[in-house]
A protein has these predicted regions:
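Active-site-adjacent segment of FAD-dependent monooxygenases/related oxidoreductases
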Residues: 1-24
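C-terminal lobe/hinge of AMP-binding adenylation domains
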Residues: 3, 203, 212-213
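Short aromatic/basic micro-patch
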Residues: 11-12, 33, 56, 216
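Conserved FAD-binding catalytic core of PHBH/FMO-like flavoproteins
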Residues: 22-23, 28, 34-183, 187-193
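Active-site flanking residues adjacent to catalytic metal/cofactor-binding acidic residues
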Residues: 65-66, 200-202, 220
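Short FAD-binding loop at a beta-strand-to-alpha-helix junction that anchors the flavin cofactor
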Residues: 192-209
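A conserved FAD-binding loop/helix module that cradles the flavin
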Residues: 209-221
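C-terminal helical "tail/cap" subdomain of flavin- and related membrane-associated enzymes
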Residues: 227-316
Length: 316
């Protein structure tokens, strides 16, 4: 996907990665992991976490990694320290599964991201080790609202994605059984409360998935937070502030670029002018690798901060 042989994109199972991270945390001997514990509220005045089952736990510092609908963020906001806004796209998504072929092999090339761009909507497919594919339809909300009957679903896929429809015998059943998910961007300012709580991951910066950078953004933020905590071990509040000052510009930058990449994926790749520009960018990078690089390549294949990649691309 870049101009160099090593510029590839690796797709891994989120479930497997979560298991690896949980195992690593548990192996330290300093982490107690509890499943099925749903946070209801953070009570700063009493220094307790309250859970939906009525249980409470005392705390010293809370690291809120509880996702886009973060209860920790809501608690920080209640103290007047955090402001946040979620902007929803008038688009949604639905996941489907492309099964293995009759002989157990992949039905499509497993070493590629497959995209069926259709202007206002698109279908993408990523291979799994089990030789099936996770397929996602991204489309405007009115499109999903029009697909209310089996006949409408069947007609839509046969008309727009005939090759895909022919490979999935239970397509209609899958479509009706699987939920339609929302797509939105959450931006926040004030990621911490004194030296008592701090946000990480989607709780601080939730973005749409079209650049494949949401988890990377979160991990980069955790690395930055860790560095500031090591530099200021006796002043957590200052460490939290420095962490946000460093990461907020990059979070906003990749949020914008992810939204732009949705347009590029569903419409740009079928625009001859856009593709000609892309080819020119790659050729210029090949000839002048230290002077020019496409924005996509800077984001995906370098450790350049997101804001720097955005600004450099704008100058080019």
């Amino acid at each position: 996907y870049g101009s160099r042989v090593h510029e590839v994109i690796h797709s891994i199972s989120r479930t497997d990665l979560n298991a690896i991270l949980l195992d690593a945390a548990e192996a330290t001997g300093r982490v107690r992991i509890e499943f099925g514990a749903e946070l209801e509220a953070v009570e700063f005045d009493q220094s307790v976490l309250r859970f939906t089952d009525g249980r409470t736990e005392p705390f010293g510092v809370v690291f809120g990694a509880d996702g886009a609908g973060s209860r920790v963020r809501a608690a920080i906001a209640s103290q007047g320290n955090c402001r946040f806004e979620t902007r929803w796209l008038d688009h949604g998504y639905k996941e489907l599964t492309l099964p293995p072929a009759d002989d157990g092999s992949h039905q499509l090339d497993p070493n590629a991201l497959h995209v069926w761009p259709r202007g206002e909507f698109m279908l993408i497919a990523l291979a799994n080790p089990s030789r099936d594919f996770t397929v996602t339809l991204f489309a405007p909300t009115p499109t999903f609202e029009a697909l209310r009957s089996p006949d409408a679903v069947r007609e839509f896929f046969v008309s727009e994605f005939a090759d895909f429809a022919a490979m999935v015998p239970d397509l209609v059943d899958q479509f009706e059984a699987n939920p339609t998910g929302p797509l939105g961007t959450m931006r926040a300012t004030g990621w911490s409360h004194e030296d008592r709580a701090v946000l990480v991951g989607d709780a601080a910066h939730a973005i749409v998935p079209f650049h494949g950078q949401g988890m990377n953004l979160a991990m980069e933020s955790v690395r930055a937070l860790d560095r500031h905590l090591r530099e200021l071990p006796d002043d957590l509040g200052a460490a939290f502030q420095r962490y946000e000052c460093e990461r907020k510009p990059d979070a906003d930058a990749i949020a914008d670029m992810a939204l732009h990449n949705y347009i590029e994926m569903r419409a740009g790749v079928i625009d001859p002018d856009h593709m000609a520009r892309r080819s020119l960018e790659l050729e210029l990078e090949r000839r002048h690798p230290h002077r020019l690089s496409p924005r996509y390549n800077m984001v995906m294949f370098s450790t350049m901060p997101y804001a720097e990649a955005r600004d450099r691309a704008a100058r080019q």
